Amino acid sequence: MSYERQNIRSLDGYSSGEQPIDDKVIKLNTNENPYPPAPGVQEVISGFDGSKLRRYPPPTADEFRNLAAKIHGVNKNQIIATRGGDELLRLLLTTFVDPLDPIGTTSPTYSLYPVLAQIQNCPVVEVELEDDWSLPTDFATRMNAAGVKLTLVVNPHAPTGKLFSKAQVRDLAETLDSVLLIDEAYIDFVDPDLNHDCLSMINEFDNLVFLRTLSKGYSLAGLRFGYGIGTESLIKPMLEKTRDSYNLDLLSQ
């Protein structure tokens, strides 16, 4: 007898990349950074006081949030720290999307999106990218027509590497009726000279959240640390209501 929910019984689940034991393997399946973290990371880990592990970690990672707010020029209350970027995706779904309400994204896209949607029992509306991997001009209107409650766009796009412009991000935030998540997992690989920073838009649009992670650009995939930057009205319910009580361990903070 199965006790699984019906939508879980039909779920294949997310296929995580294999982690080979042999460190001589050239590993490309999960887009991990081939270079080691900054030397200071190892110094902090080596100097960590293990006796502190007897206590629970700070629940909302305020020290990190204060530092990140200063770096990004935003308010601490516009930041939530998460167990990798994937936890932020889960929080967005469970906080803002009712079961049976659709979410929307591009095709192709990050393969975890439809898995999380099925766990939440939500249909997925996919719009194919153009032949040159650009975003269709009617993408937002098609999302609205489908009644999408959460729109997920990877930018720089994965797996294509296409960078959607600041003007396109602004147009999406302005046009969409849904919450808009711009997944910037690969933003650290964008040429700074392109002046592509879109974060200030969170002060203009109340439906906008950006995902950041330390897994890719900072070579810290093993620590599972990410964060969201968004308008306070979106961050607050995730931080105070739907986030796990102690979602980040002490060492990663």
Predicted regions located by residue number:
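N-terminal "arm"/small-domain region of PLP-dependent enzymes with the aminotransferase-like
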Residues: M1-R55, G147
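Phosphate-binding glycine-rich loop
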Residues: D62-P102, Q120
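Glycine/small-residue-rich loop that forms an oxyanion/phosphate-binding "nest" at active or ligand-binding sites
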Residues: G84-P99, L180-I182, Y186-D191, M201
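PLP-dependent aminotransferase-like
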Residues: T95-V153
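Active-site phosphate-binding strand-loop segment of PLP-dependent enzymes
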Residues: D131-V190
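PLP-dependent aminotransferase class I/II
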Residues: N207-Q253
